[in-house]
Regions:
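Intrinsically disordered, compositionally biased terminal peptides
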Residues: 1-53, 207
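Short, solvent-exposed loop/turn segments that connect beta-strands within catalytic domains
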Residues: 94-99
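Acidic/histidine-enriched, beta-strand-rich ligand/metal-binding domains
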Residues: 255-258
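Short strand-turn-strand beta-turns centered on an Asx-Gly dipeptide
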Residues: 105-107
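SAM/dcSAM-binding transferase cores
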Residues: 56, 60-75, 79-91, 277-317
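The AdoMet/dcAdoMet-binding core of the Class I SAM-like
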Residues: 51-62, 82, 100, 115-246, ...
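Conserved S-adenosyl-L-methionine
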Residues: 262-271
Length: 317
């Protein structure tokens, strides 16, 4: 009897050991999230500095094949290698979806001129809904200047600081998409350079709203998607401020949820070129699902895609 009990105990211990080994292998492969909000796997990836999948020629071939299949034939009307990335503009030939020009960075579609408002109106006006008086805004990225365009629709704006890594994105967007960088507007300050360094020169507790509108793939964006950078962005906000980040990667959601008392993931309608898209919203003082419209200027704006009356439809249930 005692021998049977001992055997069962030994088998139980061996089973526990094997389970722990399997868990260890899993987290070693997938990456374990530590106190800094990063996975070990992502840290190792940064050290390796391997190119992201979208920089692989095979990825480019698949992307172009999909674009032609889903939308139609196109020409590459602009192609340049800036100091940081490949910048391309493609122009579709006549198609049933009405697509014209699209901007690609390192083989990743960023926007198309016929549906970009679907993205830019949500990333700007959805959070602005919660800000009673929008005066000071910080934009991280946003080199196409389309977030800037939407922000400048608010008469209350006093200051917009935009941190953009690549000045070539601004010039290409101006040339092919007729965007405005507001160079002659004293309220707008565009700072070219590494956002992780430039942001340290700005005042803390200064902004009503922080927008992170950066590319989501490629080595140049790795420092932006770090917990410490999100932490710095939060320091820029006033007490009742709001931050929004494009994309919904699990790591980003976990990092931002560590920083803010309230977070929500909001949904964007499916767009043919970039597909289904989401944003992460964060605040310490605003319960996004329970708070009513605060911004009295928002209902007066002429918008094409975002309707404040249907605000709640964008929440993920």
């Amino acid at each position: 009897m005692k021998n049977q009990i001992i055997k069962k105990i030994i088998l139980y211990i061996i089973s526990i050991f094997l389970i722990l080994c399997l868990i260890g292998v899993y987290f070693n492969k997938e990456g374990f999230i530590g106190n800094d909000g990063e996975t070990d796997g992502e840290k190792d990836g940064k050290k390796d500095n391997k190119p992201a999948n979208n920089e692989d020629p095979a990825y480019r071939d698949r992307l172009f094949t999909d674009l032609k299949a889903n939308i139609g034939e196109f020409d590459i009307i602009h192609n340049e290698q800036s100091e940081y990335q490949k910048i391309e503009v493609i122009q579709f030939k006549k198609n049933s979806l009405g697509y014209d020009k699209c901007l690609l960075l390192n083989n990743e579609p960023q926007l198309c001129n016929n549906d970009e408002k679907e993205y830019h109106e949500i990333i700007v006006h959805f959070p602005a809904y919660y800000i009673s008086k929008l005066e000071k805004v910080l934009i991280i990225g946003g080199g196409d200047c389309m977030c800037l365009r939407e922000i400048m629709k608010y008469p209350s704006i006093k200051q917009v600081d935009m941190l953009e890594l690549d000045k070539s994105v601004i010039s290409v967007s101006k040339k092919f998409f007729n965007t405005d960088a507001y160079e002659n507007d004293p309220r707008v300050n565009i700072i070219i350079g590494d956002a992780t360094k430039q942001i340290l020169k700005l005042k803390e507790n200064e902004y009503d709203f922080v927008i992170i509108d950066t590319t989501e793939d490629g080595a140049i964006n790795l420092p932006i998607d770090e917990f410490d950078f999100y932490k710095t962005c939060k320091k820029m906000l006033k007490k009742n401020g709001v931050m929004i980040k494009n994309g919904d990667r699990t790591l980003n959601i976990l990092s931002i949820s560590k920083l803010f008392k309230n977070i929500e993931v909001i949904d964007l309608a499916d767009i043919a070129v970039i597909g289904e898209y989401k944003f992460i919203l964060g605040s310490d003082t605003i319960d996004f699902k329970k708070t009513a419209l605060k911004n009295k200027e928002l209902p007066k704006l002429k918008l094409k895609k975002y309707d404040y009356k249907n605000h709640k439809k964008h929440f993920l249930m």
